[in-house]
Amino acid sequence: MTFSLVACDLEAGDWGVAVASKFPSVGAVVPWARGNVGAVATQSLANVLYGPEGIERLASGGSAEQVVADLTGPDDMREERQLGVVDGHGGSATFTGGDCVDWAGGRTGPCYAAQGNILTGPEVVDALVEVFLATQGTLAERMLAALLAADRAGGDRRGRQSAALVVRRDGGGYGGNNDILLDLRVDDHADPVPELGRIHGIHDLLFGKTPADEFLPIKGQLATEMTERLSRIGHASLQEWADIENLEERLDPSGKMIDPVVLRLLRETTATS
């Protein structure tokens, strides 16, 4: 009833899970991850203990294959379980119990594990893998592209209902105080994977990171333009407007530079004001 991709980007320090299902709120059950430790997807007749226990075993140095064996071995219902794991070194493993409903199976390679059950066919998992490997960009962008391709290839043969994207990076969370780089969910929607992509776009707009060398100095004509535009919409400062628009994570702490994304939004907001 679910297809998922567990993956990492070792260079960026990102670990994550992308998942879609004909099941409500799949993001509350399947995806688990921790920055610089690994990621787990537990599905089919999901044993939710696989998530936290798997992460702890990975944190203790277990490989993906070891963790899969340790979790499924003592589980009397393992033949109804499905599991994907990527460890802190990019090692991967997938498990599909013999009683998972067809089509069910998975594929692994360096830094990814793709799996699904009750699918239209193996082409769904193939699409996950092939598009993930062929796509350039951040881990989140690559996983979203793969999830959309798998959905278009047929997805869950019962239909569509929910989707989720989780990415963890040490210090990657809001304010740099945790590892929750992304935790996005579509709990009940007629077309959840494209909707997840839309929500990711909003998140990237508000919390994405523009390289510091692309920021623009607030001086001269640009400073005059910004002051006029902010005044036009009733704000005395960039900080005041940005706080209302939830753009504080994109502001330059010194107040002397502006993210070009923020400038574009200011111009769009004031275009007809």
Predicted regions and their residues:
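Short, surface-exposed glycine/acidic/tryptophan-bearing loops
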Residues: G255-M257
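N-terminal nucleophile
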Residues: M1-G220
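DNA-contacting surface of Y-family translesion DNA polymerases
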Residues: V261
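A short amphipathic alpha-helical interaction element
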Residues: E214-P253, L265-T270
